[in-house]
Amino acid sequence: MGNLLGGVSFREPTTVEDCDSTWQTDSEPEPEEPGPGGGSEGPGQESEQPAQPPEQAGGRPGASPAPDEDAEAAGAEQGGDSTEATAKPKRSFYAARDLYKYRHQYPNFKDIRYQNDLSNLRFYKNKIPFKPDGVYIEEVLSKWKGDYEKLEHNHTYIQWLFPLREQGLNFYAKELTTYEIEEFKKTKEAIRRFLLAYKMMLEFFGIKLTDKTGNVARAVNWQERFQHLNESQHNYLRITRILKSLGELGYESFKSPLVKFILHEALVENTIPNIKQSALEYFVYTIRDRRERRKLLRFAQKHYTPSENFIWGPPRKEQSEGSKAQKMSSPLASSHNSQTSMHKKAKDSKNSSSAVHLNSKTAEDKKVAPKEPVEETDRPSPEPSNEAAKPRNTEKDSNAENMNSQPEKTVTTPTEKKESVSPENNEEGGNDNQDNENPGNTNCHDVVLVQ
């Protein structure tokens, strides 16, 4: 039995997202997938590595439920899709956590069994029978093959045929240890029988192994067996165990072809539709290579119906963050543009007020223009009559005339102007003369307003 290491802290994942790293490195383009049952590991694959320090192998996760509860929970979840679900499915935290620990070699657990206690290897070497039934591996492979009733209803052999580093329902079965795994891989006799056991179970499901790379296809009796598989959901738990054991004993590359085949039959051919939830929630996530998982999930997404209920794709959080960033940038730009527009409007309003001021000044000039010669008569002038008859030749007059539509000049005599001028008009004329002395005052005021 495995035991938790004292003094070593491992942060238990608390969400599905913590357990699932499938889409964390999704920059490379994916090639077109081969046909159903095809696929193998290629160069450049990304084997998933633990996020924590290197874990100790072996042992049953202490934080997991008890063995019977563990299997019952898995069986209930994997068998919960006996009919086509109409509601949108949800990710299972139990499944995500269980498969996270498997892919990461069961973090922070170590072997406490003696290295010479190689129960699983000795069983596959035909040295000991599996308990409690007392049947040897050779008898299972020769006499149980094709006996689908026995394979269906006996629930103690599967833990011996496909051992794991975690406890199952059969307490007589022993968990694998790191040392035992290495010894098992070196033993050709054990490997040969292990592959025969795998073929036997594939045929029980209606599938056959077609080559040494792990490709699979429909068996001769596939219709009968697929119907049975579609109705017996406890076998989905067995498939999960088989996939895990393949990875432990050196056949990781066999997983993808089998999972791809099951997805094709469930989603495209619709021969085993009830298995699709377990295939997407469990089978896919037994694969340690992120790239292979992404290929399978992309294939499933193309054929999953209804498409809006597919929940195993890239996290929507990352997509929404990207859209939020775009939305954040556009309001900033629009606010900047609005501020610029407001600034321009302020300038325009100031310019318009300046123009109004100029127009008012011009109107005042028009009013007092006939009175200016009075001031000229007050000043000493050698030719008062000529000055009164001629238009004024100052810069202010020319500016005023350009800005206004040539005001009419009334020629009056100095005597008439003297009679019509009052003290108030004299003051206004004085102010107007001050503006004429500084012909640039209007422009300066305009500049001050703009600033």
Swiss-Prot record:
Ranges of Low complexity compositional bias?
43-66, 431-443
Keyword Metal-binding assigned: no
Enumerate the GO terms in the molecular function aspect.
opioid growth factor receptor activity
Could you list this entry's UniProt keywords, alphabetically sorted: Receptor
The domain of life for this entry's organism is Eukaryota
Residue span of region Disordered: 1-89, 308-451
**Matching InterPro entries:** OGF_rcpt, OGFr
The answer to whether keyword Repressor applies is no
Residue ranges with Polar residues bias? 322-341
Q: Where is the composition biased (Basic and acidic residues)?
A: 362-381, 389-399
Q: Name one GO cellular component term.
A: membrane
The record lists the membrane-crossing segments as none
The free-text tissue note of the record is: Ubiquitous.
- Spell out the family assignment given in the record's similarity comment: Belongs to the opioid growth factor receptor family.
Q: What is this protein called?
A: Opioid growth factor receptor-like protein 1
Recorded source organism is Homo sapiens (Human)
